[in-house]
Amino acid sequence: MPRVHAIEDYRNFGIMAHIDAGKTTTTERILYYTGKSHKIGEVHEGAATMDWMEQEQERGITITSAATTAFWNGKRLNIIDTPGHVDFTIEVERSLRVLDGAVVVLDGNQGVEPQTETVWRQGDKYRVPRIVFANKMDKTGADFYKCLQDIIDRLGAKPIAIQLPIGEESNFKGLVDLVRMKGVIWEDEALGANFKDIDIPADLVEKAKEYREKLVEAAVELDDEVLTAFLDGVEPDEATLKRLIRKAVLTSAFYPVLCGSAFKNKGVQPLLDAVVDYLPSPVDVPAIKGVDDDGNEIIRLPNDSEPLALLAFKIMDDPFVGTITFCRIYSGTLISGTGVVNSTRDRKERIGRMLLMHANNREDIKEAYAGDIVALAGLKEARTGDTLCDANKPVILEKMEFPEPVIEIAIEPKTKADQEKLGVALAKLAAEDPSFRVSTDLESGQTILKGMGELHLDIKVDILRRTYKVDANIGAPQVAFRERVTKKAEVDYTHKKQTGGTGQFARVKFIVEPNEPGKGFEFESKVVGGAVPKEYIPGVEKGLNSVLSSGVVAGFPVVDVKVTLIDGAYHDVDSSALAFEIASRAAFREALQKGKSVLLEPIMKVECVTPEDYTGSVIGDLNSRRGQIQGQDMRGNANVINAMVPLMNMFGYVNNLRSMSQGRATFTMQFDHYAEAPANVSAEVQKKFA
């Protein structure tokens, strides 16, 4: 089956927003008007086509980015729905990697909100061309002009209106198109399907002229010929103006701002026109780079005749099809039934079922081309961020970077059956979401879930209970402490048990001292003259190792310690490996006491990004958490604060930071090193655990 749409006619874009700005409703309307969705799904009734997981339908928030294909004016739109909640920013970043452009939805009443700032910064990081849609213009308090000012003040970006609203709040009727200098109004009866051009209302003529002038002046700056003509009094025609707005979007010279009310079905068709007119096709953005087997840089052009290269950006477990891997094809042609290589993992895969997804209905296809976003069923090895490519022309596309999880909880299945289901379920969840990790605590044997935030883990637990029917108890978050000796100690210990028959006898003499940080446990025997026979040395080591997992301060693992066996004694009949194991264990515990063991706590490297107004509060709060500020710098119009903070003082921080900054500050943290805990902290931990 040959290609139906030229790659220049593709628009791979996402819809980004703060939670509740109307992103899912906007997507729903796009699907409705492009003829893909026959009944409009309302989020507040929990029926939106894009929000298809049970948890999303209940909470009214979008969690997974579903990819949907639709058509408008002869162009093929691949829409990637992205989540808008801060705990899911990993999903947003992942979507941004495979998008060519984005529509940023603002709540016309709220303007630029905290999460808008976060997704905007992520858009800057990946250099995603954007247009802005001021939604909810029918809401009480909606103010289009405040939205424009917010973009300048809070995002440090240059907005240019290409539409103005007609009517305010409940009287919102339509918009002024500043490119064509026409009014457009919608008929309420036809669910927004019918709209017509009108002359610009008299009360808006002056304002329309003022904003048209701003638009033209910003646009002509981008082309010397048009600028010269403009200075000679020649206005650019509609086609030229559109070409220049497109250029502005592609180079981020300015951001076109549109308006409407998706819920009231007004302004969606012109938004679709703007997606087609101004957002890039795959050939308008820089070609993707990768590396070959030898680490040399390779560029893959968006062309069907180039070697095949695709990136897996999302993995989902589908109850009917099994594992589905969403991929973006950057170059070449993908054909069902052929073999490819997963170059990230050096494994072969066979392409089985290929699907085009529409929220949660699917269409089987046999071929897909550069620029397509497809869902592949049944891949065995693929994980998020992996590259699949032609085995003869291998390439690894740039890897996605995922932040380390910052919060962990223990989970205990209630029954044996739950235990078995839990293992399978966690493996699937970890494959779907790289920011969610699972590990086993060797000390307690508990299964530990690690994630990006409290909501993130709540939803994982919810999925375990509903989708996989696992019943489990969830523990409170916990910190992993360690112990270490601080000074050299020498011990001489004799284990003697002689009560008729074969007794037990072993004597050991150790020097125990701190090792270099990160060196771990080291054992050396310097015994001479056979004081401890060679066959008993493994018993000595076994005794020492049994103490390492549970120290003398509060029962946490002992790290960075060196033990030297310098002398000992044995008995021809009563000595054994077991006797030396018991003697070594007791001697080591005594040496840990003598060597003044201390408690170590994990110190996290914390980065807070906050608007300047809140810098003082954020620093004060970090200091109160025993944090040490390492430095500050500016990123755009935000302040970046770097600090070292003990992990035990960081629980609940995300909620504190949100309330302290009205939700506008964000933070990341990762483990940096272990440090000695102050006496009061050590005493508190000993009281709890020892």
From Swiss-Prot:
Entry annotated with the keyword Nucleotide-binding: yes
A GO molecular-function annotation: GTPase activity
Residue spans crossing the bilayer: none
Pfam families: EFG_C, EFG_III, EFG_IV, GTP_EFTU, GTP_EFTU_D2
Any one annotated GO CC term: cytoplasm
Family: Belongs to the TRAFAC class translation factor GTPase superfamily. Classic translation factor GTPase family. EF-G/EF-2 subfamily.
Name the UniProt record assigns to this protein: Elongation factor G
Species per Swiss-Prot/TrEMBL record: Rhodopseudomonas palustris (strain BisB18)
